[in-house]
Amino acid sequence: MSYNDLVRDQYRQELDGIREAGLFKEERFIKSPQAADIEVEYPAGADSRKVINFCANNYLGLSSHPEVVAAARAGLDDRGYGLSSVRFICGTQDIHRTLENRLTEFLGTEDTLLFPSCMDANAGVFEAVLGDQDIMIADRLVHASIVDGMRLCKAQQDTYKHSNMEHLAEKLQLHQDKRRRLIITDGVFSMDGDLAKLDTICDLAEKYDAMVFVDDSHASGFIGRTGRGTHEHCGVLGRIDILTTTLGKALGGASGGCVSGRAEIVELCRQRARPYLFSNTVAPVIVSGAIRVLELISGSTERRDKLEANTVFWRQGLAAAGFDLKAGDSPIVPVMLYNAKLAQDMSRDLYDEGIYAVGFFFPVVAKGQARIRTQISAGHEQHHLEAGLEAFGKVGRKYGVLGLGKKEIKEKFGL
């Protein structure tokens, strides 16, 4: 079928349906470097304004750090803009292996392999190490990139209820006839901000002869005593078989991801993982900046400690104001609003108050689970947090949601 008027109208009707359902996503144009204070043009064509950013993955405030920028610039001058090649042809510079070795040391694993993104890492790892005689058993709230990666793999699939260890044990028992069992989980769940029970998961893996996979993208650099991740926080360093993470959040915020873990698994990814074999290498400028990031966070926990203090202050302030929050300790603090239109309307009003915090709704989260996901950074100063709490309180009072839970919000606004 050609792209005729009928097809065009069909697509337009689909888009109209998304708008009518209140599920249409808009982009905001940022006209400054990533930071706690940013300049945003919203809506498109409007005059830009300075706002406080509460929705970036810039957990350690390193995205625009002068030393990271300087290292990236030096890498650009020394190693060039790009390599115009995949890794195994002529796309591996010595700095790529340097970064992989630094990540291995920091994460406490045996080896590491860089990918263009963590989504690519998750898309490639399962197919590379599992076959149709194996089983993947995943938490039901794993990241979308994991879901997509599992779809590309020939191994059988099953799920367990979110963070329900009894259900996981049942599934592991059920699948004892499979050749290999792989438990799959996020370290920190990106929408809710809660941490996986990795200590129990590792115990179950040993009991039922399974391997463990963790995507630690929302933890690497700041969760755990020295910021190594959820596996450090849970006391299971050395017990995770496959760990994926990103350079696009706390570790500089640019792009790039990796598979880290058992040496044989990493080598199989080097030989078989299609996103690794058929994608351009991570650019030298990003590699150079990421090496400097690891130097900064390996030498001091100051930023990680500040992030933790900021998170406690922010969470306590929102709770005291009467917002319905998801429980947790991570810098992802979701303000639960349940109704998609309510989340979008409050987000727009917060923007008018100088606060940039985006509403999340289906299909990013399940229907009836809309929220404003706030994210805290070590780059936030006290005045940023206080201004944010004041604006949230003002907008919350306007919509009458303070002190309300899901049942009351549903009665007032519907789902």
Indicate where each model-derived feature is located.
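Conserved PLP-binding catalytic core of the aspartate aminotransferase-like
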Residues: D305-W314, A319-G354, V364, G368-I372, ...
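PLP-dependent enzyme catalytic core of the Aspartate aminotransferase-like
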Residues: P66, A70-A74, D78, N101, ...
